């Protein structure tokens, strides 16, 4: 977790259930996350809370009202020429008109749900099978294949973190499979890890990916991306990224690289930190007040209009 990283400021966690029951909040920096995992009304109320904070000059990152989730974000990135690959809403857009593609869910972080599909017939069959299995049509999307091996049979997925105004090149993963979701131990060489270290030292990808965060309306998160013909191609931006320290590795230089990466990350987190003290901030938006009155005595909220 970020809280385990040396030099990090104090980080407290708060669920949306806890947030929306608060009559006031202490002055602090607030980071809103996980919009693909909450329902529409919780997100709308969170946006009202965000506005209570910013109206009182509190620092808040990731506006719930405007931050884009996976499908609209990827459509936006392609529309602005920042990404070159297409995506299709399986419910609204019909079958893709470019191949190969794969299916995945719009929400959560479950990775690909199919291998590559090369024809409309394969796409239709795969979509029908996933729906029969219980996945919701409204949560499925087609994604055009966009990957390029860095050498024969080896794929690399890159990462960059946005913290306020700072973008920081992160650690990479290597895999023999184009998914490259978690990486596979033993497939990368020392030369690959030396290149990773150099990328972290020079913050190689910050300039090339800053515009993607801005277009997505995200000021805190991790972009997972690759390079295809030298061009950045962003797969997703996770507003609540998993982060773990590398304490042991067959190549010790990876441990060193991980420490080098976490130094500027901690510095960026300290830069957005807020000093404690001052008057609390009232969560006095009428919708928040009304919701608290309705649900104040329930153990579980019924977050509905």
Q: What residues fall within each predicted segment?
A:
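C-terminal active-site "lid" helix and adjoining low-complexity regulatory extension at the edge
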Residues: 218, 227-305
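Conserved N-proximal alpha/beta basic substrate-recognition cap immediately N-terminal to
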Residues: 1-98
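Protein kinase-like catalytic core scaffold
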Residues: 101, 141, 168, 221, ...
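Short, solvent-exposed loop/turn elements at beta->coil junctions and helix N-caps
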Residues: 90-92, 145-149, 224-226
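Well-ordered, non-membrane alpha-helical segments in soluble/globular domains
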Residues: 40-51, 71, 123-128, 256-266
